[in-house]
Amino acid sequence: MRKDFAVVGLYCDFHSQQEQSTTNMLGAMLKQLVSRGGIPEYTRKAFRDSQKEFGGQGLQLPDIVVMLKKTITTLPRLFICIDALDECTPKHRQELLRSLREIVRASLGARVFLTGRPHIDNEIVKFFSGALRIPLCPTSEDIRDYLEMRLDSDTDPHAMDDELRADIMRIIPEKISEM
């Protein structure tokens, strides 16, 4: 296993917004880094100690940010990947972006890759002014392929007749292309 870089990743899920607090998300990143080994003893110890606390508060956001900053300075390269950032609550998204900015400033080798719908672009730029934006737009063919895959994997194929299937395959790609 290479020790000269690390990749940590998070997936934000609309249905798990309550569990996906900034503290929990950054804690998950710290756990990923600690589990790879080669992490300073003070970070591993503080992390283990917080896990032992029963009924205690465990690590708090400022503690996690400090530990992440100290930990990433030991890595020449770190890639932080967060998918579906728009699925985060606005409060947690702001906190997460603010914390990420503080964390990556501690290391010249840290890079952040975020995905999300366009409506959060301004929030990202607020915290990462030099961020590159790469818009992704599915083609009509992508939409049709996805629909076919989903319709073909339907567990009850008799619930839909050929006419309804044809309408779905025609109308949904049209409506999406109008967006």
Protein language model annotation of sequence segments:
Residues M1-M179:
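Conserved NB-ARC/NACHT P-loop NTPase core of NLR-like innate immune receptors
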